[in-house]
Amino acid sequence: MISWHELYMVLSAVVPLYVAMMVAYGSVRWWGVLTPEQCSGINRFVAVIAVPLLSFHFISSSDPYAMNLRFVAADTLQKVLVLAALAAWSRFPARFVPPAWPPLDCSITLFSVSTLPNTLVMGIPLLVSMYGPYSGDLMVQIVVLQSIVWYTLLLFLFEFRAARVLIAAQFPDTAASIAAVHVDPDVVSLEGSQAEAHAEVAPDGRLRMVVCRSSVSRRSAAAAATPRASNLTGVEIYSISSSRNATPRGSTFTLADIPGHQPPNSALRASSFGAADLFSLHSSSRQHTPRPSSFDEHAAARARASATVAPTNDLKDTHMIEWSSGASAASEVTGLPVFRSGRETRRLVPSDAPSIASSRVIRPPPGATGGERAASFNKAVGGQDELAKLEAGAKTEQQTTAVTTTTKGGGAAGAERARGQQNAPAGVMLRLILTTVWRRLIRNPNTYASLIGLTWSLIAFRFHITMPIIVAKSISILSDAGLGMAMFSLGLFMATQPKIIACGYSVAAASMGVRFFFGPAIMAAASAAVGIRGTLLRIAIVQAALPQGIVPFVFAKEYNLHATILCTLVIFGMLIALPITLVYYIILGLL
């Protein structure tokens, strides 16, 4: 039977953590003490210094030779059972899997939600207050396994998913022909906004995939650069490294140029483009000034004489955009469009239209931002969807091609065939994923903290040596602050989110059920399977009912996979975790 004194001791150990979290929340939401920039600095300190030192402190002070192998086996078996069940579910025929639930995506999220709790920040103080110091040593063992094994496996799964998406988008028809892979040194992740790929023929004649840093990532690194003027007369064109906040200039293009449309009430600003000015839409060049076009006037005249424009009056249905142009819509500069003002009228026709589609469609290069180039006339046209399609870039176009292939294949069966065509050889995928995972791990301070702490504990408890007092006290001071700062950082995160429940109530309820009921149930079954009974079984179940871990949410947000679900579990789960774990503690104490 749980006494009131024992319940008070549990509350006295856990409530101060919630006080730190609420102080941080109030500092942002109620009192306005901290700005978003200051919150980012605090979170950076917690992630790089406080939490790694907290992990090192707990791991280095725990005796690895007294590890409870049954408890570790139960925790491992729980995760293996969940992975096996998810793997079996992902192998079901496509007709049994809802289209809105991609097996790999849901498997990663369900594994994170059901098996990876917040053991370091919440688990150690809570379990120590409930079951004594011995449970703290057990939690340290879980922390070591999470940091070294399970978070690495989770990162591997995220990178595997990112690699599949990247290859399917860039090589929809030739993925099976890839024989080698090269990853540039500055690429640390295969996530779509950070990496892009292209194919080249190796000296031995085989197809090689080259993964490089995406143009979006390069632009973000050079966003503060000063815009340069183009060498084109009378035309100021900002390079890709220019500020994103540059004010777009007006264009001479108006709705009056489209038959049957009236110009808007608000007049557009005058454009600085002259009647003879040429300008290129090539914005992904790595040079800061646009390259000169090889536009040929005589070739343009011949093109005008032979060109045929498809007659139509239904601009809405055919998604045509008229542009005042006196030149051919095709340029010899990497196949990009070059326009010149004049008396003729050209129409831009989408790629699925017949006849002149290949010579009339604007196809920006990979990485070009459509918002920057279309901002000056996006409102005037009134067809944002059409402009978005024209400005989407090669990456989106290739992704659309993959989706079209799936659609033509006929529903679920077509999706299965498309997935089969997009798969690269296993050796190529493995090398690609291991390269990026290794680069991520060697840049993560928690990896070093866990490995160094485990190494020191193995040496210290084997040869009975102690850490120098100066070093020990320095680490102790920072690690003591790390626990409170970690909760403070959680409060800052809660305050900066627009909603506590960001994924919808039904999804949140299902996720909470998986986190607080399904996970502990699997842990209880795994513990019983390895022969755990008594207090150790109670510790295992309560440990599995802790709130959601933060690292899975960080990965989910970075890889853009169900981030709202993990965000809700971190925020709302932290609020309801204390009463839920107390209920588990009381019920298990009565059994």
UniProtKB/Swiss-Prot annotation:
Residues 28-38, 94-107, 159-450, 496-511, 557-568 are cytoplasmic. One of its GO terms (cellular component) is endoplasmic reticulum. It comes from the Eukaryota. Residues 243-254, 283-292 have a biased composition (Polar residues). (indol-3-yl)acetate binds at residues 51, 118, 120, 151, 550-551. Residues 243-269, 283-313, 344-374, 392-420 are annotated as: Disordered. Residues 395-407 have a biased composition (Low complexity). The chain crosses the membrane at residues 7-27, 39-59, 71-93, 108-128, 138-158, 451-471, 475-495, 512-532, 536-556, 569-589. Residues 1-6, 60-70, 129-137, 472-474, 533-535, 590-591 are extracellular. It is found in: Membrane. Keywords: Auxin signaling pathway, Membrane, Transmembrane, Transmembrane helix, Transport. Expressed in stem bases and leaves. GO terms for molecular function: auxin efflux transmembrane transporter activity; identical protein binding; protein homodimerization activity. It is a multi-pass membrane protein. One of its GO terms (biological process) is auxin polar transport. Belongs to the auxin efflux carrier (TC 2.A.69.1) family. Homodimer. May act as a component of the auxin efflux carrier. This is Probable auxin efflux carrier component 3b.
